[in-house]
Each structure stands twice: as C-alpha cells, then as structure tokens.
Amino acid sequence: MAQPTIKDVAKLAGVSISTVSRVMNDSKPVSPEARKKVLDAINKLDFKPNELARSLVMKKSNLIGVIVEDIGIEYMAQLIRGVEEIGHLYKYDIILSSTYGDDNALENAIDFLSTKQVEGIVVISEDISAEILVKLRDNKIPFLLLDKLHDFKKINTVKIDYEKEEYELVKHLFEQGHENIAYVTLKEHNYLTDVKIAGYQKFINENNLKSMIIEADGKTSDDGYNIGEEVISQAKSENVSAISFYNDQTAVGFISYCLDNNIKIPEDYSVVGFGNFEISRVYRPKLTTVSIPNYDIGAIGIRALIKRIRGEEDILENDWVLDAQLIERDSTKKH
C-alpha cells in the first residue's frame, strides 16, 4: 500500500495543501477548527512527512555532523559526549563520522554530511590541513574546529592554554624542590608540541634553570618505554630529578621502563604527564598529570555553533579558554 501524501491529508481534512503545511511547520496562524481537522487526518492516515523534503523546504534539519579522528581515543569520546548531550538539549541530533587521520576520509565525510543537510559541522581532529579548511569554508555550512590548536586567522575555538598549563606543571615540580627538570616531547613537531615546549622553556628561563629537551619517536606508551634508556642516560649526566612528559601515555611507558630496570618512581625520579587519561589513574604509581575539561570544551563548542546557526550572539568572537586542573598523585615527591 502506498504511503499517504500531504495531498491525501488535505483531501481528508477538507483544507488546502498550504494549510496542512502551515499546521505541520507551525509557520503561520491557522484556525483551531482547521488545525483539528488536519491533525485528525494525519492520525487517521498515519501520515509521516518526509523529513529530508521538509528540511529542504525549511532549510532546517536539526542535524549536526561531527567528524572525529577516532572515537576510540579516550578524550575524543569525552569531547563527543559534551557535543552530543548539549546538542540534544537544543533539539539537535548528531551524525557521527570517523576519519582515522586520513585526509581523504575527512574530505569524504564533509561531502557526506553535506548531502544529509546538516546545519553545522564539528571537526574533532589533532591535525587539519589548510586544504581541508578551504573545503570547509567553501561548503558554506557553519563549522567548528575542536582539539586543533592552529594559527588560522578568524577561526576561534574552545581550548585550554597549553603553554600556561605546562608552565604551571613545571612550576609545581620546582616548588617541590626540583631544579633540574627535563622535558620529553615528540620528534614530529606541530603547533601543540611547540606551545607546550614554550611553556616549559618560559619557566626554565625565568628561573635561570638548565633546559633539557628530549624527543620521543611518538606519543604512545611504547614510545615512552623506548625513549627510557636515553632519558635515564641524560638524566644521570645532568643530575635531573624530575621529568615532564608530552602526555600521560609516554610518561607511563617511561615508568614501565624504569620498573623493568630497577629504577624507582618517584624515589629516583619524579614523573608527570599531561591529559589525565584513564591510564594515569590505574597504572602504579598513579600519575601526577593535568586534567583537561574535554566534556566542557565539547559542550561550550556545540552551544557556540548552534548560536551561530541560529544567527544569535557569537560567543566565540575570541577563543574561549578554560582552566585545566593539576592532579597530584603518586609519581612525584618533594626533592
């Protein structure tokens, strides 16, 4: 049996098609009598309007596309949760697409979401090329970049001040009596690695301390383990007592190396990470780290995007900077 159409509803209700449309969209006043006839006809026919067709007419789908690098990454899942929960409060549904770091997949995701008539796009990725940015701008759909520190002009975001937070982390070690503090970053530099190094270097320079920066091959726990021998060698030669790592994973990998080589943490070295990932809470010793408010970043970001979609106040005229939190655990001690 064929699905009923808006024409069938109008015929049964004894009104015009435009009257049915006004009732469905609540766009213009309709008399109570006509409204009742239309609603009765809709219920009798079990009429379900084609949402895509309605969205094309009204230019309103109540859909927001979220492109994520990898939903399996813990903090990205927290960002998505903030986006989704606040989006639902504003009556928006989320369409999720994963790219796994592939630029072609990211381009395809943008094209796919455009065909779904999304009203806005959130991109959650650590690395976005200038070419992708051009594609987003050309698409004419309001968009928001999260988890991407960049120097693109006139594209604001919600974030923490990574330079300030790394500065405060090194300051915490200094206040515990550590004066020889090393920093482990990544060989492959990007905007984020550079601002974290700047935070470390700023405190070191302000306090006339000696800088020691070591580069790991990557940001996994295996990379932290593999850099262990080099870190210990340099730490011994420079009398280092505390080491700050780019993230929690490399810090925990290094601690694992120490455990395998009869080096005690924090007795021999104080170790700190960055991110407050689950691994920092379950590994022993529990890791001193910096907690990033990822849920709040996602929640504020989606609220800003929805306001932009609706033509309301732009709450992201400048970057919205949130405070992170130092979480002191068992991997550090006073020197």
Provide a role label for each language-model segment:
Residues 1-4, 59-171, 175, 233:
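Alpha-helical recognition/docking segments in bacterial nutrient-uptake
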Residues 1-61, 75:
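N-terminal helix-turn-helix DNA-binding module of bacterial transcription factors
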Residues 16, 62, 119, 178-180, ...:
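Short acidic/polar active-site loop segments enriched in Thr and Asp
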Residues 45, 115-117, 176, 234-239, ...:
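Glycine-rich phosphate-binding loop signature in dinucleotide/nucleotide-binding domains
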Residues 68-78, 96-105, 148, 158-168, ...:
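Hinge/beta->alpha junction and helix N-cap segments in small-molecule ligand-binding domains
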Residues 89-90, 139, 204-210, 235-238, ...:
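Short helix-capping segments at alpha-helix termini
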Residues 233-242, 246-335:
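Flexible loop/turn connectors
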